[in-house]
Design a protein with these regions (language model features):
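Short hydrophobic/aromatic-rich beta-strand segments that constitute the beta-sheet cores
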Residues: 95-96, 133, 159-162
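Short, low-complexity, Pro/Ser/Thr/Gly-rich segments in the mature regions of secreted, periplasmic
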Residues: 156-176
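Short, low-complexity, disordered segments immediately C-terminal to signal peptides
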Residues: 12-31
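Surface-exposed acidic loop/strand-edge motifs in secreted or periplasmic proteins
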Residues: 29-123
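C-terminal motif of bacterial Sec signal peptides marking the signal peptidase cleavage site
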Residues: 7-10
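Beta-propeller blade signature
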Residues: 81-87, 148-155
Length: 177
């Protein structure tokens, strides 16, 4: 009889009492955005008078999804950019062109070309009818860049040259973030 009583006590002590259930808290899911980044659209313009001539220049940098994507060392992806330059002299268009990184291909080594984007542009000066801009092709969000000078002649012709004498004042340029 003692055995039956112990069995009953043992069975009744294992009964679960109803407890208030806590609401299930869902852990926030971190969404990883793997889409390519774009440098911000930038626009700059200015005017100047040299002698009897009035010059107006406009620069516009914008990301272009049709130019391909470049990945940095961390795996972050970036769209390449185009830079549009318009120069007017006495209200007539002297020069208008949209540049892509491929315009600099012959002056970049293969690896740098593959991993860089067209990054910045800045008006430099007008001297003896020549309008000059500094431009840069660089690794995205990096200090690694290749500077260039764009010279636009009085007739609207242009030439791109490597800038071997980069002046520090041109590093933070008009169209660079």
């Amino acid at each position: 009889m003692l055995l039956v009583l112990l069995a009953m006590v043992a069975c009744t002590s294992n009964e679960k009492t109803p407890q208030a259930t806590e609401p299930v808290q869902e852990k926030p899911v971190q969404v990883v955005d793997n889409s390519p980044r774009s440098l911000p659209l930038l626009y700059a313009t200015d005017t100047c008078k040299i002698g009897q001539n009035y010059y107006v220049w406009e620069l516009e940098r914008k990301a272009c999804d049709s130019l391909g994507v470049v990945a940095d060392d961390m795996g972050d992806k970036y769209y390449d950019n185009t830079i549009k330059i318009v120069v007017k002299k006495n209200a007539s268009t002297l020069f208008a062109r949209t540049f892509k990184k491929s315009d600099f291909r012959h002056m970049l080594d293969k690896d740098f070309f593959k991993n860089s984007i067209l990054d910045g542009c800045r008006f430099m000066k007008i001297h003896e009818g020549m309008v000059s801009f500094s431009m840069a092709v660089s690794y995205p969000e990096s200090d690694m860049s290749r500077p260039f000078i764009l010279n636009i002649g009085p007739d609207g012709s242009y030439m791109i040259l490597p800038d071997d004498d980069l002046d520090e004042e041109y590093i933070t340029d008009s169209l660079s973030s």
